[in-house]
């Protein structure tokens, strides 16, 4: 997801502490494609977890799931990688 990579802001405190890793989040894609109920499933640190959640909440609308020809809510999981160069 290029959008995530372009919109993540690595927290300065995490850079100073050399924090890296992958944050796993879950969320609901609503019938209109909006994102709700964002939760950290497995995190790294308070700052990186907060940034991962912020980016997911700001994402553009998704294409909603369909069941029997109708749009439905669905739960999704997504990892966000934090890596220092």
Model-derived regions: residue spans:
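A short, well-structured alpha-helical segment
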Residues: 2, 30, 34-64
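Short proline/glycine- and basic residue-enriched helix-capping loop/turn segments at helix->loop/beta transitions
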Residues: 1-25, 53-85
